[in-house]
């Protein structure tokens, strides 16, 4: 009976170890994720250049979209991740002296990012927190001005349009994933991007702004 109990315990231990190894995130594996991401700009805008009402600024509203990532495990702890997604559409609103005018335009943007990540805890741990950092490329396009913008910048004239630049920035992140089984896992992360841009109006005025958004996302992932 005693020998049988010892043998049973050894078999159970081996089974648990095998299950843990099957669920491990180890060197050479590829992880893909699909989820929802919300970008919350933290705008600090310069004044719109003359001719304009002194103290005229802009703010940019939050936007959400589907996102996806592909991650390669370089070692059991270090990985590189490519992050992309569907375009985001942000409303641009007046701020400062023109805060009361409401929406003055809109802009679409995509911001693919490459992150070098470090994962904590053992490779076979059910939950693994991680940190990351890397470059972000932001492309702004499809920018439109509103009637309110024209009323402020070019009253009585043709509609005012907005032009935006393409910019590079840097992103840091903190997140974690929880393994459901040997392939599937859940993931959540918070990212902070440091980036600035310049908006130029068809009427000649311009403004520069630090966007520095926070992104919050949740996703489901699969390990190959």
Please tell me what each predicted stretch does:
Residues 1-28:
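Cleavable N-terminal export/targeting peptides
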Residues 23-69, 221-223:
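Short glycine/proline- and aromatic-enriched beta-strand/turn motifs that initiate or cap beta-hairpins
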Residues 89-93, 181-224:
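Predominantly the C-terminal beta-signal and adjacent terminal strand-loop region
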Residues 69-71, 175-179:
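Short, conserved structural micro-motifs that define repeat-unit consensus positions
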Residues 29, 38-42, 69-148, 213-224:
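Gram-negative (and chloroplast) outer-membrane scaffold detector with strong preference
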Residues 27-29, 63-64, 109-110, 167-169, ...:
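Membrane-spanning beta-strands of outer-membrane beta-barrel proteins
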Residues 44-58, 88-109, 139-166, 197-210:
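Flexible, solvent-exposed loop segments that connect beta-strands
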């Amino acid at each position: 009976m005693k020998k049988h109990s010892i043998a049973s315990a050894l078999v159970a231990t081996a089974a648990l170890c095998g299950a843990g190894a099957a669920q491990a995130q180890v060197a050479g594996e590829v992880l893909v994720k699909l989820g929802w991401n919300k970008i919350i700009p933290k705008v600090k805008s310069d004044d719109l250049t003359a001719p304009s009402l002194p103290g005229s600024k802009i703010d940019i509203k939050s936007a959400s979209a589907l996102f996806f990532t592909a991650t390669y495990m370089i070692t059991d702890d270090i990985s590189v991740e490519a992050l992309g997604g569907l375009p985001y559409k942000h409303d641009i609103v007046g701020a400062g002296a023109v805060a009361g005018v409401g929406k003055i335009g809109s802009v679409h943007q995509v911001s693919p990012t490459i992150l070098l990540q470090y994962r904590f805890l053992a490779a076979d741990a059910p939950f693994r927190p991680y940190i990351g950092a890397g470059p972000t490329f932001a492309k702004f396009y499809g920018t439109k001005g509103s009637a309110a913008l024209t009323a402020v910048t070019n009253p009585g004239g043709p509609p005012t349009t907005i032009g935006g630049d393409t910019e590079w920035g840097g992103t840091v992140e903190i997140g974690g994933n929880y393994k459901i089984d040997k392939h599937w896992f859940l993931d959540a992360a918070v990212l902070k991007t440091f980036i600035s841009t310049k908006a130029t109006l068809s009427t000649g005025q311009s403004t520069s702004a630090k966007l520095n958004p926070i992104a919050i996302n949740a996703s489901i992932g699969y390990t190959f």
